[in-house]
Design a protein with these regions (language model features):
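A short, basic N-terminal segment
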Residues: 1-44, 299
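Conserved NTP-binding/hydrolysis module of P-loop NTPases
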Residues: 10-13, 17, 74, 84-102
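Short conserved motifs of the RecA-like P-loop NTPase core
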Residues: 106-113, 125, 201, 213-228
Length: 375
């Protein structure tokens, strides 16, 4: 298990790109298509085609369909299409337990039809699922068309489900493929998840892995929403979230934030607007810091102003009374003459003290007599 799973106290890695039914999340299309296939199988309608962009969950859907059907269904699953129609028939014959005497298409198809008749007579059905069908050649598509023609009355002897990327429809829409297109009983398309669906999908996978959605912070969720503002596919979502968790782990964080998501988009080469969101967050943080600095400066200036105001408070009545008793005349800027007889110091000491006091208080222009400071 990856170290980030332990770091975030997860029991499982939540965003591995493997078709694990444990993490399956039905965002709407899957349930509809599974219901469509089930109904088609019951009614024997025949050929169903499902397309969708890369990573939209087609393979996961096929795995879920395999798990849906009981043992009475003869299920044949192909991870990718064969190179040609002959290989297709030989593969089906082998899966049905047949040993054709010849590899000629006519004889192989005869044996396949016989086996399918036996299956249907037993009250069973056969379903063939072919993944990555967009890789099919026109020869293989025509081989599928011939298989779809195998019928017993109004009942199709074999049910066919083709899963492929949108390129499959480009092939089907060609003029020469009209006979094939006319035989499609149901055509479905897996679309991208909406932004709301993306967030629910991520939450679901985190919870299945034993985690809490709080592992992604508010800015992290917002960045993910921006990254998938036009929708997302399971594969891309898994890749981005897996890398975001890994980035946060490398930075020893307890939760994924917008910067981690942005770093993940950079590592994946995704072009999103997350960068602009980061710039906005940085600007808000800078403004908040500037506002705090202004507040701190205002507090300091207020304290300094209050201190200066306290230093300029008028003398108390007792000091004024004492001053007036010594010098009844109004005090101006001049330093009053003090009789030396009252000072118990030498002439030199007196002069030094008086001059120092005079110089000090003339500079500050304080209206207070030196005698009060010497007393």
């Amino acid at each position: 298990m990856h170290m980030y799973a332990q770091h975030f106290n997860l029991k499982l890695l939540p965003f591995e790109n493997v078709p694990d039914p444990l993490f399956f999340y039905d965002h709407g299309d899957h349930a509809r298509i599974r219901k469509q296939i089930s109904g088609s199988l019951q009614s024997g309608r025949g050929l169903i085609v499902v397309t969708g962009p890369i990573g939209s969950g087609k393979t996961t859907l096929s795995q879920m369909i395999k798990a849906d059907f009981p043992e009475s269904i003869q299920l044949i699953w192909m991870a990718e299409p064969p190179a040609n129609s002959t290989d297709l028939y030989l593969f089906l014959a082998q899966e049905l337990g047949l040993h054709p005497a010849s590899s000629e298409k006519t004889f192989v198809m005869r044996d396949i039809r016989s086996a399918l008749m036996t299956i249907n007579s037993q009250g069973k059905k056969c379903l063939v699922i072919i993944d990555e069908s967009h890789l099919m050649s026109e020869d293989v598509l025509n081989g599928i068309r011939l298989l779809n023609n195998l019928e017993e009355g109004s009942i199709k002897l074999i049910q066919l489900l083709l899963l492929g990327q949108d390129e499959l429809m480009e092939k089907i829409n060609k003029p020469e493929m009209v006979p094939f297109k006319q035989r499609i009983a149901a055509l479905e398309s897996l679309g991208k998840m909406t932004t709301d669906g993306v967030l629910k999908y991520i939450t679901h996978r985190i919870q299945v892995a034993g985690g809490n959605p709080n592992l992604i912070s508010a800015t992290g969720w917002e960045a993910i929403s921006i990254a998938f503002s036009t929708g997302g596919t399971p594969r891309t979502i898994n890749s981005l979230c897996d890398r975001s968790f890994n980035v946060a782990y490398e930075r020893n964080k307890s939760a994924i934030d917008a910067k981690d998501v942005y770093e993940a988009t950079q590592r994946m080469g995704l072009i999103t607007d997350v960068f602009h969101y980061i710039i906005m967050l940085n600007n808000e943080e800078r403004k908040k810091q500037e506002s705090q600095d202004i507040t701190d400066q205002s507090i300091q200036e207020s304290i300094a102003s209050e201190t200066a105001s306290n230093n300029e408070q008028p003398l108390s009545p007792n000091i004024k009374k004492a001053e007036q008793s010594i010098n009844p005349h109004p005090i101006g800027n001049e330093i009053p003459v003090i009789p030396r007889a009252r000072m118990d110091v030498s002439d030199k000491s007196y002069d030094e003290i008086a001059n120092a006091i005079k110089e000090k208080y003339e500079q500050k222009n304080l209206k207070i007599s030196v005698i009060l400071l010497l007393l």
